[in-house]
Amino acid sequence: MTSETSTSGRKVAVVTGASSGIGAATAKQFAAEGFRVVLGARREDKLEAVAEEIRAAGGEATVYKVDVTSDDDVVALAKAEPRVDVLVNNAGGAWGMESVEGAVEEKWRWMYDVNVLGTLRVTRALLPALKTTSGIVLTVGSIAGRQVYTGGAGYNAAKHAERALVEVLRQEVAADGVRVTEIDPGRVHTDFSLVRFDGDETKAAAVYDGVESLTADDVADIIVFAATRPKRVNIDFLQVTPIDQVGGAKPKK
């Protein structure tokens, strides 16, 4: 963990999966809004690069190596950060595109662990702090949690389960003044597909070839907007897609 000690009393935004893509873009935008940002992910070198960019722009950033599938990592984060105003559950991912018949259970377990149990672990650990500040939990889901597609069963199942978790949580903590929002993006041009295809750059590039995808900043804009509404305003969920994916349409490629 590295940090820059702050006595400014700034609000604190915790972002998981903050080493690249949507997480990194979200952290930078929260910093620009005056938050001290807490960056968590597995790739500490990349986290440091994001943090240095934030600090160079006059912001405050703290870095923790956090694997959301590790109870120890998550508990350590919660102990180190007693104040949390915003939690962005962004860590997640897909692995493979096998059919149901060809399903690889190891991949299904990993997707459930990182997308569902990862969100559970971090949210559960930070809820006491969020209740103290009447904060907000924002979870980056996916249109895969609302629409299914061939080859996506493992990821679809995980994201549907994550959505159920979020919807129950919203009901359970409303009386504590904690807002709960889900942001469900469609196709975003990040490292998502590179991870899904085990680093196969050709397969990953084909996902984005010939279509205009959302950018990480597009999604970060929406996350920060939802988080900065008045405390009386709860946005249950927002679904955002590139124009070729509206209404569940297949990309025009």
Task: Cite the ranges covered by each PLM segment.
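Conserved glycine-rich Rossmann-like NAD(P)H-binding loop of the short-chain dehydrogenase/reductase
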Residues: 33-48
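Conserved glycine-rich cofactor-binding loop
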Residues: 19-20
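Substrate-binding pocket helix/loop in short-chain dehydrogenase/reductase
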Residues: 98-100, 107-109
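The beta1-alpha1 cofactor-binding region of Rossmann-like NAD(H)/NADP(H)-dependent oxidoreductases
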Residues: 45, 64-76, 105
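Active-site helix of classical SDR
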Residues: 123, 158
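C-terminal helical subdomain
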Residues: 182-186, 201-249
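Residue(s) in the substrate-gating loop at a strand-loop-helix junction
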Residues: 142
